[in-house]
Amino acid sequence: PITKNSANPNYVFRVSAVDEIVDRGMVDYAQNTFKTSKFGLIMVNNPWGESNERGIVAALTAKNMKAVGIEKFEGSDVDVTPQLSRLRAAGADTLFMVGNVGPSAQVVKSLDRMGWKVPVVSHWGPAGGRFTELAGPSARDVHFVQTYSFFGKQSPTGEKVIAALKAKYPDIKGPEDISPAVGVANAYDAMKLTALAIQQAGSTDGDAIREGFYKIGKYDGLIKTYEKPFTPEVHDALTEKDYVWAQFVDNRILPVGMAK
C-alpha cells in the first residue's frame, strides 16, 4: 500500500479504502451474505486488477480456500461471455469482480446474455459513474464496497455536511445528488484530520505536521468517530469495520438491505 512505502520518514496518510483490506472484506462478505464457497475471479487486466487478484487469492489462502478460476478482461471488451462461461463450467457460485464502470457493466450484461444468475461481489469500481445506465436492470445485483453512504440515518456531522452541500450547490437536492459519496466523505474527513494535525503542530512545517497526525486524539468525523487514527506504524485511518456494502437501486447507491 502507498501508506507502507518504506520511506523514513513516511509522509503519506490516508482516509480511504485499502485494497488488501477490501479483498479480505469481499471474501468475508460473500461467505456471510451468500453462504457460498466456490469463488471465481473476474478481473480487469491492469495493475489494479492484478493487485486485487493477489489480495483475494491471499485472503482465500488464509482460509484454506482457493478460487475455482481466475479470468481477466480488457477495459475495452464488450463481451465477457467466454471468460464467464469458463468460470461457470468450473463451478463458481459467486464472482469477485474488479473493474471500473464500463468494463464492470459489460460483465453484468454478459451474465444477462448467458442467463446466469450468480452473486457478484465487487470492489468500488461500479460506483464511479453511469453503471445503471450501462449495465441495465441487473446492475442492482452487484454488491460493492463503499466507505460511506449519505442515505439512512445520519450522524450530526452527516446532517451538517448534507446541509452545507445543499446550501453551496443548488443542484444537490438530496443524498442521491452527492456523487461520488465516498470521494466526498473521504476528502472531508481527510481535510479535517489534516487541519487537526496542523493545529497540533502549530505550524505548516512538514515534519511538524507529520508528528501532529500522531497527536490527534478524538475526532467526530463524517465516516466515523476517530480515536487516535494514526500511529508511526499505522497511516490508514479506516479499517474493514468502516466499510459499507452497497448496491444500485433506481440509480441511487443504497446500503444493502435498505432497498424497498
Where does each model-flagged region fall?
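Extracytoplasmic ligand/sensor domains, especially the bilobed periplasmic-binding protein
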Residues: P1-G69, K117-F144, F150-F151
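Sec-exported extracytoplasmic/periplasmic mature domains
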Residues: A7, Q31-T36, V57-M65, S85-A92, ...
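Segments of small-molecule ligand-sensing domains
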Residues: P170-A185, M191, A195-P255
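Extracellular/periplasmic periplasmic-binding protein-like sensory domains
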Residues: P9, V108-Y188, Q199, Q247, ...
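Short acidic active-site motifs
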Residues: D79-Q83, P103, R130-F131
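Structural motif
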Residues: V22-G25, F73-R86
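Periplasmic-binding protein-like
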Residues: K38-M43, G91-V101, V107, V118-H123, ...
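Catalytic-loop motifs flanking and including active-site residues across diverse enzymes
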Residues: V22, N52, P103, N186-A190
